[in-house]
């Protein structure tokens, strides 16, 4: 199963966020160059919200113009199930997500049709870090 461990932090303003990124302690563990990724995100669900009812999230995100479909499912603590597909069509992506280990029920739900429930556009600034020998992206 795919697994994501995520901890989100908040900064009071852009200047504070820039200061964190430039901090010597961050620079000491940064192993990759800073990158900017333009993202357009749409969340998808069935008309009766069956995906959300299972506490799953089905998302189509465009990252610098490339489509990425993701399904996330509940997990323990900060962890959760997560699978990604870079297929262009929802049908192909769902088939691949299930093949990768996402719940098989997703195919049945998506076959009944899904539509956009909400969305957002943003710019992500990211860099790879190595913490205690573990690569973090």
Regions of interest found by a model, annotated:
Residues 1-137:
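Phosphate-end processing signature that detects enzymes handling 5′-triphosphorylated RNA
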